[in-house]
Amino acid sequence: MKRPLIFLILALAVLSISAVSGADNVTDIESVSDDVILAEDVVQDIYSADGGEIENTKSDSALVGKDTTGYEQFSTDITVSLMSNGTALASKQVIFNVDGKNYTKTTDSAGHATLNIKLSNGIYTAGFFFLGDNDTNPSNGSSLITIKSPVKTSLKIADKDINYRQGLKSVFIVRLVTSTGSGVSGKTVTFNVNNKKYSAVTDKKGYAQIFLSLKKGTYRVSYSFSSDCPYLSSSGSYNVKVKSPMSKGNGYWMWAGGIKTVNLKTLKQKGTKQIFLNSYAFDLYGKKTVTSWIAKAKKYGISVHIWVQIFYEGKWIKPLKSDGSLDYNLMKKKVSKVVYYSKIKGVAGVHMDYLRFGGTAHKYDNSVKAINYFVKKACAEVRKVRPNCIISAAIMPEPEMNKYYYGQDIPTMTKYLDVIIPMAYKGNYHKNTKWLNTVCKSFVSKSNGAQVWCGIQAYKSDNDITRLSHSQLVKDAKSCMSGGAKGVVLFRIGVTNLLNFYKV
């Protein structure tokens, strides 16, 4: 086989002309360490001294590249593969011609040569050439390089209603999105708050979150995303206001009549810090009498929360219309009720009970959405008028089934609440003391901010209201606390031996 003269003539011609795009489109060249080779430098004599043609016994080579897409402002890799009879050719020089300029790269052990280059927006033809050697014939090829505009991004606060309070470990969430609003997944976001740095990777919807445990005050949280092809960098900041801490969550639920019978002095002596007073007390005794009693309790160091029933009034009330959509009018009335009690003088908090479906949530598409909406709305409206009001909710003690049966989405609800109180009534569930520990651990792990104060049954069960002994109450309370609870709430005054919380 004779070495064709025409190949070198064509190679010289190609190397001497420009590619599709003009030379002024090249913005930067990265990692180009080899000298630029001019076509005429590679011309070799193609005839022997006696004027005869040299017989070619060399192997053929193949130089193959693929069409590539890159982005302006980012480097683009143009990679080719040099092979001969199925074998990779290593340590061979390959010439790339892009936008009128030539660059030389050397193949690696796999026969690959890569040019790393920055180009402006446009479409380019990249030529690549292997000029052959003593053993191998030359080869060449070309591919299209398409350079697109980079993708602009922004970082947005995902939820401005999240609750921050000293003593809580509250979630802080941002979302990385494109200019069209699509979430960007798998990217690292860096946070800086109170001279500490954190990082988190965005999920499939573009959300990145960290947890903040801060003392009372106002903090500037900054967050940023560094450019990562094809996405451009973005950043932002947000002020977080952290409220004052809560006292220990040790106390009791109490029916309205308790304000006439309970001994506040005795409760104080036993370390009681919280009483959840049923709102019916206002109907039964009037606002003046109740507020006077609340003031008296406060003198004993006991905080009073108004215990409000939400979606149960002798029967279950669905926060949904007949067509399954959210009943905003109903929920607005219920929110107003919660806000009303929060504004009463001396009230430390509002406690929402029956904040759920009665075991039928799975029958309605929007059940979870309705409960989440109500919790977020109620918390936001209360904090407009009483920023430091403690907002709590009673929840069912079934961590894996709360959403399915009751519409209680714990990770979402706990972003807004200060406290959740799982009603871990072991007698009703035919469970033992260890179960209380398990329940508390599960809810602590699911919380995105709210503390867990565990609600325990002070009597054997609803079928047997025999009071549990003080020693048994202590064991139950300790089990809750070892599970991560920050307090224990007993159900209830009137059917309980008073617990000495100092022994817990």
Name what the model sees in each region:
Residues 65-86, 128, 161, 165-181, ...:
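Beta-strand-rich structural segments
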Residues 251-255, 305-309, 370-407, 450-461:
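Aromatic-lined carbohydrate-recognition surfaces of secreted/lumenal glycan-active proteins
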Residues 249-254, 290-298, 303-345, 474-476:
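Active-site-adjacent "subsite" loops/lids of carbohydrate-active enzymes
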Residues 243-273, 310, 393-397, 459, ...:
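Boundary/entry segment of secreted carbohydrate-active catalytic domains
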Residues 23-69, 75, 83-84:
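Low-complexity, acidic Ser/Thr/Pro-rich repeat tracts that form intrinsically disordered stalk/linker regions
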